[in-house]
Amino acid sequence: MLALHEWGDPAAPALLLVHGLTESAAAWPDAVARWSSRYHVLAVDQRGHGVSPRWDDEALARAPQTMQEDLERVLSSLAEPPVVVAHSLGGLMSLRAGAARPDLVRALVLEDVARPTGHWGPAPWFVEHQERFLDAFADGGAAERERMRRESSWSDAEIEGWAGCKGQVDRRYIREGTYLGEADLVSAVNRLTVPTLYLAPRHGDMAPDPSEVTNPLVRLVLIDGVGHCVRRDDPEAYHGLVDPFIEKAFGNAGR
């Protein structure tokens, strides 16, 4: 079972946070601080991240399916279906899990979902890029922290959470497991049967074309002036859309 971290009142409506590549449950500090007074906030460490199990040969041979099944097991263990809030790689796994097992999900909030391209093995250029990126944190990442303070508008808490995850990444997953399988983003979005808010940067390269999204349960919002990490780049825009959506999903049950 994946490591699961919790904040807030266990009797409150549940949110499940699912992080992206090279991050962990520790990568949501501002969201946790904002939501934990109203909701039971849970956050997973995906396999090979944080303190969750590492990868083995069998799991790597079917990495996308393994990650989806990991998430479905977590969802099945919860007392009631949560609103799932997910980013990038976590967004893709949450999208696929929500399409396959809508009985386990109350609603979805997806942030710039990683777009699968139909590949069944890691791209060498991507592996090299990620290895170099993670190598920059071998000394604790002080230079990377300072770079983000100069170049981004992220809060200090978000920068520290983002940087602190890197040393816990299973490098074997980076080298052998970073492929996403079937190019099913649009078809999965249009199969969803749960309310879904899908946020992405207007000038990004991973979101579906709005004309392709025909599912009336899915609201795709393209946001100006942000990059891949929408909630960090523009928390006001992110929460202005996400918080009312969560409240509506729970029928205003959040406290």
Give names to the regions the model predicted:
Residues 33, 42-85, 240, 244:
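Active-site loop/oxyanion-hole signature of alpha/beta-hydrolase fold enzymes
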